[in-house]
Curated annotation (Swiss-Prot):
NCBIfam families found in the cross-reference section: PRK09284.1, PRK13352.1, thiC
Pathway where this protein functions: Cofactor biosynthesis; thiamine diphosphate biosynthesis
Source organism superkingdom: Bacteria
Annotated source species: Prochlorococcus marinus (strain MIT 9303)
Designated gene of the protein: thiC
Binding positions for Zn(2+) per the UniProt entry: H279, H343
Positions that bind substrate: N80, M109, Y139, H175, S195, R196, G197, D236, S237, L238, R239, E275, Y302
One GO BP annotation of this record: thiamine diphosphate biosynthetic process
GO molecular function, one term: zinc ion binding
Reaction(s) catalysed by this chain's protein: 5-amino-1-(5-phospho-beta-D-ribosyl)imidazole + S-adenosyl-L-methionine = 4-amino-2-methyl-5-(phosphooxymethyl)pyrimidine + CO + 5'-deoxyadenosine + formate + L-methionine + 3 H(+)
HAMAP family in the record: ThiC
Binding-site list for [4Fe-4S] cluster: C423, C426, C431
Name of the protein: Phosphomethylpyrimidine synthase
Job description of the protein: Catalyzes the synthesis of the hydroxymethylpyrimidine phosphate (HMP-P) moiety of thiamine from aminoimidazole ribotide (AIR) in a radical S-adenosyl-L-methionine (SAM)-dependent reaction.
Cofactor(s) demanded: [4Fe-4S] cluster
Length: 459
């Protein structure tokens, strides 16, 4: 779809959506997003120019269907997939991608760390994906030197970052906010550093006794990104990994640096969103969202969860969806899903489905709470179908139609029950929705009350 759109831009020094928006140009991607979000083109252009909305759209991702991440658009959901040295292969990752897109992922991140040819799996995912693809390049940078921190140099990072851009990656998590002076702040934590990318860079700084190369070479990364329109997802290396560590000095020190890096990227006309925690008690979620908006000048916020309790391994898609719904309500632009396997193992395709549905619920609930135009239309339509016992319509409107039909049919599988005015919960005689209160019923009731000298029904 985009091949003809981007053909004229190739070779330009800066092809980012932010660059065009600041020149007053409405790109085809902005027009597409405006129609998709039911927003005026001018508003989309203004939000992109201001940095409050990004359209991750690498010029080398030709089959991408453009989408927006920002406060003015609907709350989005990212699904993480990726192979590890211990599990998965290319076919398995493509199956996860297919399921993620089927169940509504707005973006997908390939977090492969090994076990497969990383370039092969990434290009296969990009070529098969209509949604933006994100990556964490430090994983491959370390893999390229066979896991040897001592052999990893600054140019290795930049080489991998540009390779990902050339392959069509739409946004990259760049852990540039973790500085060498932040490392002492980690000592008082219960769980230390829980970001894999952050852990790699902390090891690099401790071994080489030098500043984070992604920070010192940040302007070079900006120069790479603007040639491809790759967006920054500024990584939160010091996100809290437990309730105890939430909103601590380490997290907030890095957030301040991320705010400064946001401005530096904007100075290059490069699009930016900022990643956030993590594990956060419910009473601290609003503070975290407001603080990010303040420090990062309202750049889109992209949070992992946050998990609101740490005692439910196997159910962290639930513990985190609670926090995600709240974060979305307070203004977070995109939610990164968590699967039931979080903290336990590599997710399989069914885990992807479970995590994604939990987060689509959270994002949709946030849109309703924020009174986004049309956000509740589907809810109202399903409610009408429920009241009218239109079972097939209910299934069709569900976030997971297959699961809804499966649960209904476990006890009432025959087709005749798709017209029944009950389910197996209440049975044929006790469903309250069978009670239809009509105007005729109310007129009869009012006449009866009047004949007995009772008060009239309220209007």
């Amino acid at each position: 779809m985009r091949a003809s759109w981007v053909a004229a831009r190739k070779g330009q020094a800066n092809v980012s959506q932010l660059h065009f928006a600041r020149q007053g140009v409405v790109t085809q991607e902005m027009d597409y997003v405006a129609r998709r979000e039911n927003l005026p083109e001018s508003l989309v252009m203004e939000e992109v120019a201001r940095g409050r909305m990004i359209i991750p759209a690498n010029i080398n991702h030709a089959n991408l269907e453009p989408m927006a991440i920002g406060i003015a658009s609907s709350c989005k959901v990212n699904a993480n997939i990726g192979a590890s040295p211990n599990a998965s292969d290319v076919a398995e990752e493509l199956k996860k991608l297919e399921l993620a897109v089927k169940y509504g992922a707005d973006t997908v991140m390939d977090l492969s760390t090994g076990g497969v040819n990383l370039d092969e799996v990434r290009t296969a995912i990009i070529n098969a994906s209509p949604v933006p693809i994100g990556t964490v390049p430090v994983y491959q940078a370390l893999e390229s030197v066979h896991g040897s921190i001592e052999k990893l140099d600054e140019d290795d990072f930049l080489h991998i970052i540009e390779k990902h851009c050339q392959q069509g990656v739409d946004y990259q998590t760049i852990h540039a906010g973790l500085l060498i002076e932040h490392l002492p702040l980690v000592k008082g934590r219960l769980t230390g550093i829980v970001s894999r990318g952050g852990g790699i860079l902390a090891q690099w700084m401790l071994y080489h006794h030098r500043q984070n190369p992604l920070f010192t070479r940040f302007d070079d990364i900006c120069e790479i990104f603007k040639r491809y329109d790759c967006s920054f997802s500024l990584g939160d290396s010091l996100r809290p990994g437990c309730q105890h560590d939430a909103s601590d000095a380490a997290q907030l020190a890095e957030l301040k640096t991320l705010g400064e890096l946001t401005k530096r990227a904007w100075a290059h006309d490069v699009q930016v969103m900022v990643e956030g925690p993590g594990h956060v008690p419910m009473d601290q979620i609003e503070f975290n969202v407001r603080k990010q908006m303040e420090e990062c000048n309202e750049a889109p916020f992209y949070v992992l969860g946050p998990l609101v309790t740490d005692i439910a391994p196997g159910y962290d898609h639930i513990t985190s969806a609670i926090g995600a719904a709240m974060a979305g309500w307070y203004g977070t632009a995109m939610l990164c899903y968590v699967t039931p396997k979080e903290h336990l193992g590599l997710p399989n395709p069914e885990d992807v489905r479970e995590g994604l549905i939990a987060y689509k619920i959270a994002a949709h609930a946030a849109d309703i709470a924020r009174h986004r135009p049309g956000a509740r239309d589907r809810d109202d339509e399903l409610s009408r179908a429920r009241y009218n016992f239109d079972w097939n319509k209910q299934f069709e409107l569900s976030l997971d139609p297959e699961r809804a039909k499966q649960y209904h049919d476990e006890t009432l599988p025959a087709d005749i029950y798709k017209q029944a005015e009950f389910c197996s919960m209440c049975g044929p005689k006790h469903c309250p929705m069978q009670t239809k209160i009509t105007d005729e019923d109310l007129e009869g009731l009012e006449k009866s009350l009047k004949s007995k000298g009772k008060a009239e029904l309220p209007a």
